[in-house]
Every structure is written in C-alpha cells, then in structure tokens.
Amino acid sequence: MGEGGSAGLAEVGLAVDDVPGTAALLVRRGLDVEGDVVSITGVRWRLTEARSDEEVSSPPSPLTLDHVVVSATDATRAAADYGARLGLDLRLDRDTGFGFRGMFFRCGDAIVEVVVRREGDRRDAFGGLAWRSADLPAERDRLVEAGVEVSEIRAGRKPGTVVATVRDRDLRVPTLLVGPA
C-alpha cells in the first residue's frame, strides 16, 4: 500500500555508493530523510547500496527499468527537489502537447519522469513504471501466454519507440513496456 492507504507503488530504491553519507548530504540539502528513506512531498525513495554486476547472482532479465513516473503539481519545486536537492540530472523540460509538462531526470540507467499537470499544493505521487525490452513483441507474447492482459503494441511518444500497456489489476501500478520501433 502506498502512503495514505492507496494501493500501488509505495517506494522506489535508489542505488548509491554510501547510504549513510548520501543520507547526510540529502539532509544538508533540506530533504526529509529518516534512516535510509528520503521523502519528497509524499514520494518515498529508499537508499540502497549499489552493487556491481559481479555481485548480482540472478540471471539477466529480459526487462530493465526504463523510467519511473512521478506526478507533481509544482514544476519549480519539483525541479529543485529532484534536481538540486536529490541530485538527479535534469535532461529535458518541455510542454508535451498532451496537457502536461514533462521533466525528465537521468538517474543511473533510468529516467525519473516528473509529470506536472497543474500548479497547486497536492502531494506528489508515483504514477507508474516503464520497463525497457529489446524485443517487445516477444515480451508481450510471453506475458499474454502467462495470462497477463497487455494492450496491442503501438507507436510510443518518444520517436523510434513502440509501447504496450500492462493491464493487470493485481499489479496495482500503471505499467508500460517500451521497445525499439
């Protein structure tokens, strides 16, 4: 369960080289940190020790995290919190033409996409996950064969991509699969 009792994504892990050192730095930057959890206007990020590829014992996954979506209502505060305070690299800030502003922050191999729909003082919230697949048609077929409801593949908003939406109610997190066109 998410904060406030809502179902869905409760927190996302951020791999860092030094959890205590990073936590102390984020406190100095004015963020709310309790132990290894950083809270940004209702969104919880858990600091975890980064591991090298050699330390990971599981086989490679056909899916890798492409981006985490955060919905926000104040673009200036979001830029300050996710960029200057948390230290993510703001790569793109634009009006999407779809009724919201998109702010894209680089975070390791993934992106934190902050979607700003309107100004206000509502708390931020996780809006979903997008997973990258080198072979989206095969991944979609695998999921459908496993009984997961997945939309047809369609053109993505980012040029050169295709996407499919996972519509599994048990997942409770809006989920998108992204692949090359």
Model-derived regions, located:
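Acidic/His-leaning functional-site neighborhoods
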Residues: M103-R132, E139-R140
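Conserved active-site tyrosine of GNAT-family acetyltransferases
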Residues: L26, A78-G83, L143
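Conserved donor-binding loop and adjoining core beta-sheet/short helix segment
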Residues: M1-A10, R157, A164
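N-terminal beta-strand motif that seeds the catalytic metal site of vicinal oxygen chelate
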Residues: G5-V16, R46-A79, R85, F126-W131
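Vicinal oxygen chelate
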Residues: P20-T64, R94, F98-V116, V144-A181
